[in-house]
């Protein structure tokens, strides 16, 4: 049975703010159904201040069990685990990015979302969780290359794929050998990707990440000296959370490197956590000669997010790309 929570807002409530219409997590979570599929979740279920079942999202073990249950019930991921301390992402938000990305592809293809293994996506920083490739292949049939600089992250992702053979054939893992680069040294000169996606490091240093986390917990009324809280409520290792110069520097580097692969990628995309980083990124992309730059806004609960998409292909090149690679697309809604 769910146990009552403390008066503090330990558990997040699903807000009226809309997820993408195709997101499988619209509405409230079906905890009885989730527990039926994954009984281990039951010990983490609490009653939140609104009288509804939920979990304590400050508890990494609870979040991991919750994610495992969601992945099994909605995405046919039978075995999923990550090492302690690695990023344990919120599934609904990750799914939203993919659905809006699918819409972007559809808008580039007369309202028809291209689906199936003929399409390839590059996930920059796939992490130990391998979330974007798992969700993207399940929802749209796309093939993925999941790239990372961290060997342990890739080992964890490989273990997930080994436990889920139906995904393994569609998802390739690659190590970026040089942490100074994003695409260079990773993308072969002869290959093409229909899209790239990325959840960039947010902070400039571990110290900055720690300070930001303490501010967050204080604002939530959870900065209790007697309680050991995780660095972030969804965890994260060094390369997942911070890089030199923070998000702004990472985005500038990604934009700069993308130019060398202008004809090999249809849509480059990346999440942008700080809205204040948008103007510089957009200006940088204009300077580099991007032919189309878009900001796609999203909302998950109380959180506002967005991703930036850009392409260097002109209209003639886009038409040729669509004819060659997207001819087996399926109409929207199917």
UniProtKB/Swiss-Prot annotation:
Q: Per UniProt, what is one GO molecular function of this protein?
A: 23S rRNA (adenine(1618)-N(6))-methyltransferase activity
Q: Pfam families, alphabetically?
A: Methyltransf_10
Signal peptide start and end residues = none
Cytoplasm among the record's keywords? yes
Query: What does the record give as EC number?
Result: 2.1.1.181
What's its catalytic activity?
Answer: adenosine(1618) in 23S rRNA + S-adenosyl-L-methionine = N(6)-methyladenosine(1618) in 23S rRNA + S-adenosyl-L-homocysteine + H(+)
What InterPro entries does its record include?
Answer: METTL16/RlmF (IPR010286), rRNA_lsu_MeTfrase_F (IPR016909), SAM-dependent_MTases_sf (IPR029063)
Spell out the subcellular localization from the entry: Cytoplasm
Main site of residence?
A: cytoplasm
Q: What domain of life is recorded for the organism?
A: Bacteria
Name the keywords, alphabetized: Cytoplasm, Methyltransferase, rRNA processing, S-adenosyl-L-methionine, Transferase
Segments for region (Disordered): 1-25
Q: Tell me which PANTHER family the record gives.
A: RNA N6-ADENOSINE-METHYLTRANSFERASE METTL16, SAM-DEPENDENT METHYLTRANSFERASE
Query: What is the protein's known function?
Result: Specifically methylates the adenine in position 1618 of 23S rRNA.
Q: Which family does it belong to?
A: Belongs to the methyltransferase superfamily. METTL16/RlmF family.
The protein's name in its UniProt record: Ribosomal RNA large subunit methyltransferase F
Q: Which organism is it from?
A: Pseudomonas paraeruginosa (strain DSM 24068 / PA7)
Q: What is the lineage of its organism?
A: Bacteria, Pseudomonadati, Pseudomonadota, Gammaproteobacteria, Pseudomonadales
Q: Which gene encodes it?
A: rlmF
